[in-house]
Amino acid sequence: MTFRTNPSAPLWQTRLPATFRPSEKLAGLLQSPSLTAALRDLPCEFSVRLLYLGLADGSLLLDGGGPGKSYFCRDVELCLDGEPVVWARSQCLPSSGYWRQMLDCGNRPLGERLFAESADWQRSPLEFAALEGIPLPSVQNAQLARRSFFQRQNETLGLVECFLPALAGYL
Protein backbone atom coordinates (compact mmCIF):
# COMPACT_ATOMS: atom_id res chain seq x y z
CA MET A 1 0.00 0.00 0.00
CA THR A 2 1.35 3.44 -0.89
CA PHE A 3 -0.02 6.90 -0.39
CA ARG A 4 1.03 10.51 -0.73
CA THR A 5 -0.94 13.49 0.58
CA ASN A 6 1.49 16.12 -0.70
CA PRO A 7 3.06 15.78 -4.18
CA SER A 8 6.45 17.09 -2.95
CA ALA A 9 6.45 14.65 -0.02
CA PRO A 10 7.97 11.17 -0.05
CA LEU A 11 5.94 8.18 -1.17
CA TRP A 12 5.38 6.01 1.91
CA GLN A 13 4.96 2.24 1.67
CA THR A 14 4.90 -0.69 4.08
CA ARG A 15 7.90 -2.38 2.43
CA LEU A 16 11.39 -1.12 1.77
CA PRO A 17 11.41 0.76 -1.57
CA ALA A 18 12.43 -1.45 -4.49
CA THR A 19 15.07 1.10 -5.50
CA PHE A 20 16.78 0.76 -2.11
CA ARG A 21 18.81 -2.45 -1.86
CA PRO A 22 20.28 -2.65 1.64
CA SER A 23 22.56 -5.35 2.96
CA GLU A 24 20.86 -8.06 5.00
CA LYS A 25 22.19 -6.52 8.21
CA LEU A 26 20.95 -3.03 7.29
CA ALA A 27 17.56 -4.40 6.21
CA GLY A 28 17.20 -6.05 9.62
CA LEU A 29 18.09 -2.85 11.43
CA LEU A 30 15.69 -0.80 9.29
CA GLN A 31 12.81 -3.13 10.14
CA SER A 32 13.61 -3.49 13.85
CA PRO A 33 10.68 -2.49 16.10
CA SER A 34 13.06 -0.52 18.35
CA LEU A 35 15.79 1.33 16.48
CA THR A 36 17.34 2.26 19.84
CA ALA A 37 17.72 -1.42 20.77
CA ALA A 38 19.07 -2.33 17.32
CA LEU A 39 21.69 0.44 17.41
CA ARG A 40 22.70 -0.47 20.97
CA ASP A 41 23.32 -4.04 19.80
CA LEU A 42 26.09 -2.83 17.49
CA PRO A 43 29.67 -2.90 18.85
CA CYS A 44 29.79 0.91 19.14
CA GLU A 45 29.01 3.59 21.68
CA PHE A 46 25.39 4.70 21.16
CA SER A 47 24.28 8.20 22.12
CA VAL A 48 21.50 10.69 21.46
CA ARG A 49 22.09 14.35 20.66
CA LEU A 50 19.06 16.56 21.33
CA LEU A 51 18.80 19.19 18.60
CA TYR A 52 15.44 20.79 19.39
CA LEU A 53 12.49 20.45 21.74
CA GLY A 54 9.49 22.74 21.43
CA LEU A 55 6.89 24.11 19.05
CA ALA A 56 7.62 23.96 15.33
CA ASP A 57 5.89 23.54 12.00
CA GLY A 58 4.96 19.93 11.37
CA SER A 59 7.36 17.73 9.47
CA LEU A 60 6.69 17.08 5.81
CA LEU A 61 7.81 13.52 6.56
CA LEU A 62 4.91 13.08 8.97
CA ASP A 63 2.34 14.71 6.67
CA GLY A 64 2.21 17.68 9.00
CA GLY A 65 4.12 19.98 6.69
CA GLY A 66 2.76 23.28 5.63
CA PRO A 67 2.27 26.71 7.11
CA GLY A 68 0.06 27.36 10.09
CA LYS A 69 0.08 23.94 11.77
CA SER A 70 2.31 23.83 14.85
CA TYR A 71 3.31 20.70 16.70
CA PHE A 72 5.35 19.94 19.78
CA CYS A 73 8.52 18.46 18.27
CA ARG A 74 11.67 16.71 19.38
CA ASP A 75 14.52 16.55 16.87
CA VAL A 76 17.53 14.37 17.64
CA GLU A 77 20.53 12.72 16.07
CA LEU A 78 21.21 9.11 16.97
CA CYS A 79 24.97 8.65 17.03
CA LEU A 80 27.43 5.77 16.95
CA ASP A 81 30.86 6.57 18.37
CA GLY A 82 29.79 10.23 18.33
CA GLU A 83 28.92 10.26 14.61
CA PRO A 84 25.30 10.99 13.57
CA VAL A 85 23.80 7.99 11.74
CA VAL A 86 20.07 8.78 12.08
CA TRP A 87 18.14 12.05 12.24
CA ALA A 88 14.76 11.65 13.96
CA ARG A 89 11.73 13.79 14.67
CA SER A 90 8.89 12.98 17.03
CA GLN A 91 5.86 15.23 17.02
CA CYS A 92 2.49 15.51 18.71
CA LEU A 93 -0.17 18.15 19.10
CA PRO A 94 0.74 20.82 21.67
CA SER A 95 -2.34 19.81 23.71
CA SER A 96 -1.11 16.21 24.15
CA GLY A 97 0.07 16.11 27.75
CA TYR A 98 1.09 12.44 27.74
CA TRP A 99 3.20 12.57 24.55
CA ARG A 100 4.75 15.95 25.45
CA GLN A 101 5.88 14.52 28.77
CA MET A 102 7.22 11.43 26.98
CA LEU A 103 9.21 13.59 24.54
CA ASP A 104 10.80 15.66 27.31
CA CYS A 105 13.62 13.19 27.93
CA GLY A 106 16.71 15.24 27.06
CA ASN A 107 19.53 13.17 25.59
CA ARG A 108 17.92 9.89 26.61
CA PRO A 109 16.55 7.76 23.77
CA LEU A 110 12.80 8.03 23.26
CA GLY A 111 12.78 4.31 22.41
CA GLU A 112 14.10 3.56 25.89
CA ARG A 113 11.06 5.27 27.39
CA LEU A 114 8.52 3.98 24.87
CA PHE A 115 9.46 0.33 25.17
CA ALA A 116 10.38 0.31 28.88
CA GLU A 117 6.96 1.43 30.08
CA SER A 118 3.90 -0.73 29.87
CA ALA A 119 2.70 -0.48 26.31
CA ASP A 120 -0.71 1.12 26.71
CA TRP A 121 -0.40 2.51 23.19
CA GLN A 122 -0.94 1.04 19.74
CA ARG A 123 1.61 1.44 16.97
CA SER A 124 0.94 1.64 13.26
CA PRO A 125 2.95 -0.57 10.92
CA LEU A 126 6.33 0.83 9.90
CA GLU A 127 6.31 2.72 6.60
CA PHE A 128 9.37 3.42 4.44
CA ALA A 129 10.23 6.05 1.83
CA ALA A 130 13.16 6.76 -0.44
CA LEU A 131 14.28 10.35 0.08
CA GLU A 132 16.23 10.93 -3.12
CA GLY A 133 15.10 14.21 -4.66
CA ILE A 134 13.00 15.23 -1.63
CA PRO A 135 14.07 18.65 -0.26
CA LEU A 136 14.58 18.25 3.49
CA PRO A 137 16.16 21.30 5.14
CA SER A 138 16.79 19.50 8.45
CA VAL A 139 18.37 16.36 7.03
CA GLN A 140 21.49 16.24 4.88
CA ASN A 141 22.04 13.31 2.51
CA ALA A 142 19.51 10.91 4.02
CA GLN A 143 18.57 8.23 1.50
CA LEU A 144 15.79 6.43 3.34
CA ALA A 145 13.31 7.13 6.12
CA ARG A 146 10.89 5.11 8.16
CA ARG A 147 7.96 6.32 10.17
CA SER A 148 5.23 5.09 12.46
CA PHE A 149 2.48 6.54 14.59
CA PHE A 150 1.73 5.74 18.22
CA GLN A 151 -1.85 6.11 19.45
CA ARG A 152 -2.88 6.45 23.09
CA GLN A 153 -6.30 7.63 24.27
CA ASN A 154 -7.04 9.42 20.98
CA GLU A 155 -3.69 11.24 21.02
CA THR A 156 -1.07 10.56 18.34
CA LEU A 157 2.71 10.69 18.36
CA GLY A 158 4.38 10.65 14.96
CA LEU A 159 7.95 9.38 14.67
CA VAL A 160 10.17 9.59 11.59
CA GLU A 161 13.75 8.31 11.42
CA CYS A 162 16.00 9.30 8.50
CA PHE A 163 18.98 7.07 7.88
CA LEU A 164 22.23 8.88 7.10
CA PRO A 165 24.99 7.46 4.85
CA ALA A 166 27.41 7.13 7.81
CA LEU A 167 25.33 4.24 9.19
CA ALA A 168 26.67 1.86 6.53
CA GLY A 169 30.18 2.20 7.97
CA TYR A 170 29.06 0.61 11.25
CA LEU A 171 27.42 -2.49 9.79
Task: Explain the meaning of each model-derived region.
Residues 1-171:
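Composition-driven recognition of glycine/serine/threonine/acidic- and proline-rich low-complexity segments
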